[in-house]
Regions:
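Juxtamembrane intracellular "pre-TM" segments in multi-pass secondary transporters
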Residues: 2-15, 210-239
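Short amphipathic helix-loop junctions that connect adjacent transmembrane helices
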Residues: 37-53, 253-271
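Glycine-rich segments within core transmembrane alpha-helices of 12-TM secondary carriers
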Residues: 65, 152-177, 192-193, 362-374
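Helix-to-loop junctions at the C-terminal end of transmembrane segments
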Residues: 68-81, 177, 283-297, 381
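C-terminal ends and interior cores of transmembrane alpha-helices
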Residues: 90-115, 306-319
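A membrane-interface helix-boundary motif in multi-pass transporters
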Residues: 114-117, 175-192, 379-402
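Intracellular juxtamembrane helix-capping segments at the cytosolic ends
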Residues: 133-147, 336-351
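Multi-pass alpha-helical transporter architecture, strongest
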Residues: 194-207, 395-427
Length: 427
């Protein structure tokens, strides 16, 4: 009875739109991570692209997914979140279907004679445009549908549901891929998004913000981009931090290829990645946060960076399902140590009065990592496979991780020196 009462209190403490938006986010992430985990294998084994070509296409798609929300948020604010959700889920539902249709025999006659590469490129860019409205609309709803008292808890619920989707989506993808084929994973993602379109139309009600003020124009957003780019210390930090995400996304680039080619074609790489990664975060995020909360922000980021970088040694020594799973769990521990502190550090580094502006570019390192890292991952694997030495990919990732860790340590050292000098001058 006490548990039921507590759950009811939590439910009633938020506006109904909060739960609708987060429920839609769960299914959107389910759709995204479900298709992302099979993306590289689908492009190579079904559509006939090389690993290098697949990496390039993945980089464009993933890069746009994380870059466009910077501008998509402006349109979402202007249109209202309900309308933005309608547009987003309509485009995502159609986009995922089109991507999957390229591998379906039923559509072979329609696409015959067309350049598969450029056709897929068009479908990916179209789908990424739809995805650009999701995060701003969900995070915007969380912000306006919660109070100052429960807002922190509201974002914790959002983060937990994102990881739940990241675990459930690839799990479903495995069973669909095993029974029907990779192309039908995109059909599941499409159905999931169209279902959320229906949910949005029926259940989502716009929440009016208590804060009043003019919505930033698209021109103002672009001008703000140059303000952020002009902050040298912030940009150096973001560029170094992007090295972390380059390594992370190899779980979706290199790991599926390696398991498929060298461990077993039917091996459940989807479950290995999702349960070891997102599953670990769901279970251990809160206790790890409590254990590391007193570590200085930059130190916590460095520790998380180092842990996530060096774990590839576990895989490199003896690549197998158990060691890959163990490596991904260890990587997730590193992520849990540093990820929450990353946003905290952005608030610290931002000039007074510009914290919100700088937080708006928090996803920029992921966009950089996808644009750069996905093609690198595809090329690395392709080259190692041709050379008959697939294990070199793990040592290459270790090299990137060590380099990134050293860069972050150097950054921390010089920032500490700079801050000490500033303190002396101000004394």
């Amino acid at each position: 009875m006490h548990i039921r009462q507590s759950l009811a209190e939590i439910k009633n403490s938020f506006h109904p739109a909060f739960w609708v938006a987060n429920g839609m986010e769960l299914f959107e992430r389910l759709a995204y991570y479900g298709q992302q985990i099979v993306f590289m294998v689908y492009l190579r084994n079904r559509l006939g692209f090389t690993e290098t070509e697949a990496g390039t296409l993945s980089g464009i798609f993933g890069g746009l997914i994380y870059l466009l929300p910077i501008l998509g948020g402006t349109l979402a604010d202007k249109w209202g979140f309900r309308r933005a959700f309608n547009i987003a889920f309509s485009i995502l539902g159609l986009g995922y279907f089109l991507i999957g249709s390229l591998g379906m025999s039923a559509f072979a006659g329609i696409y015959g004679g067309l350049s598969l590469y450029w056709l897929l490129m068009a479908f990916l860019v179209f789908t990424a445009f739809g995805g650009s409205f999701i995060k701003p609309s969900v995070l915007g709803t969380v912000a306006v549908a919660s109070t100052e008292k429960n807002k922190s808890f509201g974002f914790a619920i959002y983060y937990w549901l994102v990881n739940a989707g990241a675990m459930i989506g690839p799990t479903i993808a495995y069973f669909v891929r095993d029974s029907f084929g990779n192309e039908f994973v995109y059909l599941v993602s499409s159905v999931s998004c169209f279902a959320m379109l229906a949910v949005n139309l029926v259940l989502y009600k716009e929440v009016k913000s208590e804060k009043t003020g003019a919505t930033e124009s698209l021109g103002k957003k672009i001008a703000n981009l140059f303000v952020v780019l002009g902050n040298f210390k912030f940009m150096i930090f973001l560029l170094i931090y992007s090295l972390y995400w380059i390594i992370f996304w190899q779980e979706f680039i290199i790991v599926p290829y390696y398991i498929t080619d060298y461990i077993g074609k039917e091996a459940p790489y989807e479950i290995v990645q999702s349960w070891a990664g997102a599953g670990a975060i769901i279970l251990f995020q809160i206790p790890i946060n409590r254990l590391t909360k007193n570590i200085p922000t930059r130190t916590a980021i460095l520790i998380g960076f180092a842990v996530s970088s060096f774990i590839w040694i576990i895989i490199g020594i003896h690549p197998s399902i158990p060691t890959i799973a163990a490596g991904i769990v260890a990587f997730a521990i590193g992520e849990m140590i540093q990820a929450p502190r990353y946003y905290e550090y952005i608030s610290e580094i931002a000039p007074p009065g510009q914290q919100g502006l700088f937080q708006g570019y928090a996803f920029l390192p992921i966009a950089i990592a996808r644009f750069v890292g996905d093609p690198i991952g595809g090329w690395l694997y392709h080259s190692a496979k041709l050379a008959g030495d697939p294990s070199r990919v793990w040592w290459s990732l270790i090299g990137i991780g060590v380099f990134g860790t050293l860069c972050m340590a150097t950054y921390n050292k010089y920032v500490a020196i700079f801050e000490a000098k500033q303190a002396i001058r101000g004394a």
